[in-house]
């Protein structure tokens, strides 16, 4: 058997902007942050529409299906402020996400805006 050399690392200096999808990308799925957010989205729909839990949940999933995101449905149908929605539904317990200094350093070392 011959030993293979590591793959060549391409320069990333041409990248000017980075966008990171946080959900299960920069933290492990086991943190289960989405379940907290999902419950808060349902609560938000309940507040905006004055519906009970089951009806709000059904509407939430319908907006997701019909508009691509629940937020888009709420904006189109209820004139919801997206900043208020995002701040509200992301006010969760982040303690399941453990510190990962190597990841922080790797992202900091990337060129461009993050």
Q: For each of these PLM feature ranges, what is it?
A:
Residues 2-3:
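A charged helix-plus-loop insertion that forms the helical arch/lid used to bind
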Residues 6-20, 25-104:
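N-terminal helical cap/lid subdomain that shapes the substrate entry/recognition surface
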Residues 80, 112-113:
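A structural micro-motif
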Residues 95, 113-114:
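A general structural signal for well-ordered secondary-structure junctions
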Residues 102-112:
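Catalytic-core regions built around general acid/base machinery
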């Amino acid at each position: 058997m011959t030993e293979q050399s590591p793959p060549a690392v391409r320069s990333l200096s041409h990248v000017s902007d980075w966008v990171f999808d946080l959900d299960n990308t920069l933290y492990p799925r086991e943190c289960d942050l989405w379940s907290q957010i999902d419950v808060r989205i349902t609560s938000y729909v309940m507040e905006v529409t004055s519906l009970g839990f089951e009806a709000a949940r059904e509407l939430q999933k319908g907006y997701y299906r019909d508009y691509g995101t629940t937020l888009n449905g709420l904006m189109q149908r209820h004139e919801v402020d997206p900043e208020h929605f995002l701040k509200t539904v992301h006010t969760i317990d982040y303690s399941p996400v453990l510190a990962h200094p190597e990841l922080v350093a790797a992202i900091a070392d990337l060129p461009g805006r993050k």
